[in-house]
Amino acid sequence: MATDFLFPKIADCSYVSCYCEENVWKLCEQVQRTRPEELSKCYAVFVSNEGRTVPLWRQKAGRGDDQVVIWDYHVFFMHNPLPNRCLVYDLDTTLPFPTYFHKYVTETFRSDLALRPEHHRFFRVIPADTYLIEFSSDRRHMRRPDGSWIKPPPSYPPILSNTNMHCLGDFICMSAGKGPGAVYSLSEFVQYFYKSPHVVAQHNK
């Protein structure tokens, strides 16, 4: 891999376990601050489905040799600077940081064909600049009924937009036509973002 990564070291990234949506927001913020010319090529990607049961492999929280886990949702960061160069930055994966799109999708999501329909994955892809403006979370989803934390929150204040106290559900929702960005099935997601070098070469002739 080349070394012109947006985030050379995972240790230099803001990270709090179980707050993936905020971790990715912080990555977008870092690009806006340090590499603003690249922000338009970056995306926040939410993974979920109607039942909020999505299996992912190669996750630090996963079990067994395949490190599989079932999340209610997950969020990762993508940088797509060229047609045949899309990199995924997932702070919760056991794959390299970053990983090329095709390898990440193949090892993390595998295929929907072997899964029950209720476990099929959908992807809400939001441009990074939109995510920075519209995302807002007061972290209520991480509190128990008695007000205690399910997992300790980040030390910085909640990320709040000017218009909404808590809109996390709009990002997790996978209904087309609702919420920011665009929603894709797994096959649509791959078709949209994966361009093999051969296909790109043919297109450029």
Curated annotation (Swiss-Prot):
Family, as annotated: Belongs to the NTAQ1 family.
Keyword annotations from UniProtKB, A to Z: Hydrolase
UniProt enzyme class: hydrolase
Gene, per the UniProt record: tun
Reaction(s) the record says it catalyses: N-terminal L-glutaminyl-[protein] + H2O = N-terminal L-glutamyl-[protein] + NH4(+)
Function: Mediates the side-chain deamidation of N-terminal glutamine residues to glutamate, an important step in N-end rule pathway of protein degradation. Conversion of the resulting N-terminal glutamine to glutamate renders the protein susceptible to arginylation, polyubiquitination and degradation as specified by the N-end rule. Does not act on substrates with internal or C-terminal glutamine and does not act on non-glutamine residues in any position.
Gene3D superfamilies: Protein N-terminal glutamine amidohydrolase, alpha beta roll
Gene Ontology CC: cytosol; nucleus
InterPro entries, per database record: N_Gln_amidohydro_ab_roll_sf (IPR037132), NTAQ1 (IPR039733), Prot_N_Gln_amidohydro_ab_roll (IPR023128)
Species of provenance: Drosophila mojavensis (Fruit fly)
Active site: C20, H74, D90
GO molecular function: protein-N-terminal asparagine amidohydrolase activity; protein-N-terminal glutamine amidohydrolase activity
Record EC number: 3.5.1.122
Full protein name: Protein N-terminal glutamine amidohydrolase
